[in-house]
């Protein structure tokens, strides 16, 4: 999903241009890969297993994450929570955490805020944009979506590495690592509240149901 094409009209003629997806979503993938390395290096500190998955087909209404949960992975009932890393490359756009107002996940975020952190996310009450967390909500799995939000270069040829803020991404990575560790070491499970999800997503884009 990190590169594609778009058709623009130049001098009255359709011209196909490449867009590179540096922020959408090579930035999230880069954070995921480095986070996986950090978790592996410090695996003895994690009480729960942490599974890293990169989903494709987001433009097909998140078919990749749907397929993982419904066709590929047999142990979805053992998933306690999901962390969605999507578009994390901007430095002047804010850093957000969307949980569909999940009390348990918000409690972890607030606990982390009381500790020394390189950056803190703003908890968003409303879904910032649809992403792969949607498929996990459909399975009643709590999920948090970390992102720097929407941006004008998305799905255009201007989505190049020049718009990325690498220092900010490093701060986000360190925070997300600390959050992942706190989530993995938390006592008990995390409750899913379907009423919260339906309320927060009711005015957002529809998601196709696959069979």
Q: Where do the PLM segments sit?
A:
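Acidic/histidine-enriched alpha-helical segments
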Residues: 45-55, 82-85, 186-205
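C-terminal recognition in membrane/secretory proteostasis and scaffolding
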Residues: 156, 204-211
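His/Asp/Glu-rich mid-to-C-terminal helical/loop segments that flank catalytic regions of hydrolases
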Residues: 30, 152-202
